[in-house]
Amino acid sequence: MKILIAYTASGTSDNPCVRLLADGIRACGYEVVCSVEEFRSNAADYDIVHLQWPEELFRWKAPAPADVDTLEQQLQTLKNNGIPLIYTRHNTLPHHGNPLVAEAYGLVERYADAIVHLGDCSLREFTAAHPDSEQLQVMIPHHIYEGLYDMDITRDAGRRALGIPADRLVVLAFGAFRHAEERRLVWGAFRRLHYPAKFLLAPRLWPYTRRGSRFKGLKRLAGRLLYAAAHSAEGFFDSRITSPEPLIPDEQLPCYLAAADVVFIQRTDILNSGNVPLALSFGRVVTGPASGNIGGLLAETGNPAFDPADPRSVDIALERAARLSATDQGARNRAYAQEHFGIGRIAAMYGGLYERLYDGKRQ
């Protein structure tokens, strides 16, 4: 069976989720091609087409109305040719509110033959919004990043690599900060945490970097000066809130997770976060919003959740996470992730879905 995943898995992506999944599906015996260009020009040559983020179809740039019209034509052609379309629902709506991208989300959801939900909240949300839908609804969790990261690096080794004192409670907020509210959430919660020796590890909290700035001229110079000022103040605030690069290299990422005691998910309004299964797989205690699929997973695994709009709720959750970091909660998290989110298990679940749709097409 020939599978097309409409995603440019170049190996340099900020998010390696899809390329790892594709490798896992190939290991199950399927021919898998990851390409947006193939979706645009040769989708009819495949047995199954699998979409991830609709934004990927526009190369994460703002589409023109004609681009959305073309997408609908492509989706209609797939339907006319009887080629099953699968959509993995990572988000409810686009993060940045572009109405044309939101329209593309609606088209993909409407034309999909099967919708994969990464958690129960997504499934309930979608079926409530579309009670008459006859599409196949399937729940397949987010996989962990086996084979990409060294998950056996020790806490001491991670801290030595990053220059973090061994005796600190380290709170890690990982990934991009999408807006100022996420920065305020993390910084405020950390400052209010009643812990005598604490350290905030949030390498992308500060929006300026030493290299890789998109600005030019005076704006680039100002960005570098702001980066230098924040970098100089880190020792005073017991924190690491700057990064010289826009992205953390894959080979350094395990050091950050190994160094942490608690992983803080800073999203204020989101359906999914791959950082939750990632942190669980490294055996770290996690705290995050009690919403979307994140809230359900945290409750299932015994990790504290909070209401981002309620500072007291955030404080209680972070304090509880700090206490849990001294127990076997991290070990339980790791065992849970390995049992439920292993790439082999998740890839096999997708393989079963492909077979189900392919067999249905032939009947």
Regions found by a protein language model. Name each.
Residues 165-181, 190, 201:
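Conserved donor-binding/catalytic core segment of Leloir-type glycosyltransferases
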Residues 325-359:
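A charged, aromatic-enriched C-terminal amphipathic alpha-helix characteristic of glycosyltransferases
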Residues 265, 285-288:
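Short hydrophobic beta-strand element within catalytic cores of glycosyltransferases
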Residues 299-312, 319-326:
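Conserved acidic donor-binding segment of nucleotide-sugar-dependent glycosyltransferases
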Residues 113-128, 132-150:
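Donor nucleotide-sugar binding/catalytic pocket of nucleotide-sugar-dependent glycosyltransferases
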Residues 212-255:
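Nucleotide-activated donor-binding/catalytic signature segment of Leloir-type glycosyltransferases, i.e.
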Residues 149-164:
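A short helix/loop element that forms part of the nucleotide-sugar donor recognition site in Leloir-type
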Residues 278, 291-305:
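Short acidic/histidine- and often glycine-rich active-site loop of Leloir-type glycosyltransferases
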